[in-house]
Amino acid sequence: MYSRSELLLLLAVASVLTGCVTTPPYVYHYIPGRTATLENGYAVAPPTAPLPVTEAIDAGNELIGKPYRYGGGHKNYYDTAYDCSGAVSYVLHSIGRMNTPTPSKELRDYAQSGPGTWITVYASRGHAFLVVAGLRFDTGYGGREHGPQWLTRSRPADEFVMRHPYGL
């Protein structure tokens, strides 16, 4: 049996150790042949990308120009407007990696933990975005909401967990 002071010390050490884990910010790094590029707001897959990655980029491109709407893409994958997790769900569904539109906080438990080789889901309790072949697919940051778009602009991710589809 542990004494009260030993238990408090263990609790303090555990809280410090778990508090040290933070998700690094998203920062775009171009790697020739491995990173997607942008042309007029649309993503172009790198030549070495596997088929599911190319399909994910194509699916994200289908949503470019759609407006933002809270709850958009949740009743049906095919909607007239999308919120963050609706857009993420649409892309993952298009590559056969999601069966039901999923809210941001539930994406925190999606598939495998950690960053993916090609696709990473960043999820917090209130927002989600994707990074596909190095490009960020997002609906908002900095107090502004907009429809789904591909971005190279950096953003903090300290409130997010990183998850990825199996094998990607």
Q: Which functions belong to the PLM regions below?
A:
Residues M1-L8:
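Bacterial N-terminal signal peptides that target proteins for export
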Residues Y2, V16-P67, G143-L168:
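Intrinsically disordered, low-complexity
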Residues L8-T18:
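Bacterial N-terminal signal peptides
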Residues V13, E62, Y90-H93:
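Residues within well-ordered alpha-helical secondary structure of globular protein domains
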Residues Y42, G71-N76, K105-Y110:
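Short linear capping/connector segments at secondary-structure termini
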Residues A49, I57, S89, H93-L168:
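...with weaker cross-activation on analogous glycine-rich loops/strands in unrelated enzymes
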Residues N61-A81:
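Active-site nucleophile-His-acid catalytic modules used for acyl/amide transfer and hydrolysis
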Residues N76-I95:
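Active-site nucleophilic cysteine motif
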